[in-house]
């Protein structure tokens, strides 16, 4: 039974990721006053499958000077981590109920840095290496903010268990008392997933395509799949942490439906930002984090630690 659940979850995520790619291309098309993909299948609905077929049937070329093992392992590692992160998410019942679910997500998502680092270094290309250095610095930097925001959230929730967040938000969303945290979290997730306006790693005018410049065919597709899977995951986390859905034990499908709608709306916001905003300069990106977000999240963390002590109120203990 657990194997069937795992397969169903994986298949659902991969199908959602495929159609997210199509949706993005459609939205970008309409914002630029054109149609987007509309040839393959009705309204272009079969375009993701045509792309997958094309990429996975092509010969995966490899630079002769590359480090073979790391070059091959990196894309597979990126997608594996992206799928692994879904296991502790309660929708409303998680695949694996972890007491330290938030910590697991934080620790596992930080491993994505290795796939980026290996892919750029193993490619033996200057463009890929510069893209890698940018991506790694950006990802590691914004993880600090995400960790501090999660720490503030679990001080309000009282547990590392993600299922507790559903109980915490029975009466009102955490978005209402902690909207500055939610705003910084959302912007940090944009940076963490290397999305516009923070897509410095894929600065086409400077770096060709970033850390995946030397990749083609299947491995290239795996990187893209990992990126879009991470986008859905980050929005699912945002919906779970700040826009919690009340769970009625008699109708779990209602919880799942509402949770999915919230995730879809947040993902649409990601796509709207992609089609609207220009790319930041690299120094502005780092300035935003180290000079603005970090002091503010630290101040809010101190506030969330000191307030319960001052008022002799403690969060629910599990």
UniProtKB/Swiss-Prot annotation:
Annotated GO biological process: mitochondrial electron transport, NADH to ubiquinone; mitochondrial respiratory chain complex I assembly
UniProt-listed Enzyme Commission number(s): 7.1.1.2
Swiss-Prot/TrEMBL catalytic activity: a ubiquinone + NADH + 5 H(+)(in) = a ubiquinol + NAD(+) + 4 H(+)(out)
Protein topology in the membrane: Multi-pass membrane protein
Cellular localisation: Mitochondrion inner membrane
Keyword tags: Electron transport, Membrane, Mitochondrion, Mitochondrion inner membrane, NAD, Respiratory chain, Translocase, Transmembrane, Transmembrane helix, Transport, Ubiquinone
Alphabetical list of Pfam families matching this protein: NADHdh (PF00146)
TM helices/strands, residue ranges: 2-22, 69-89, 100-120, 146-166, 171-191, 222-242, 253-273, 294-314
Enzyme class, broadest EC rank: translocase
UniProt keyword annotation of Mitochondrion present: yes
GO cellular component: mitochondrial inner membrane
GO MF term set: NADH dehydrogenase (ubiquinone) activity
PANTHER family reported in the protein's UniProt record: NADH DEHYDROGENASE SUBUNIT 1 (PTHR11432), NADH-UBIQUINONE OXIDOREDUCTASE CHAIN 1 (PTHR11432:SF3)
Purpose: Core subunit of the mitochondrial membrane respiratory chain NADH dehydrogenase (Complex I) which catalyzes electron transfer from NADH through the respiratory chain, using ubiquinone as an electron acceptor. Essential for the catalytic activity and assembly of complex I.
Record-stated family: Belongs to the complex I subunit 1 family.
Record text on subunit structure and interactions: Core subunit of respiratory chain NADH dehydrogenase (Complex I) which is composed of 45 different subunits.
Protein name: NADH-ubiquinone oxidoreductase chain 1
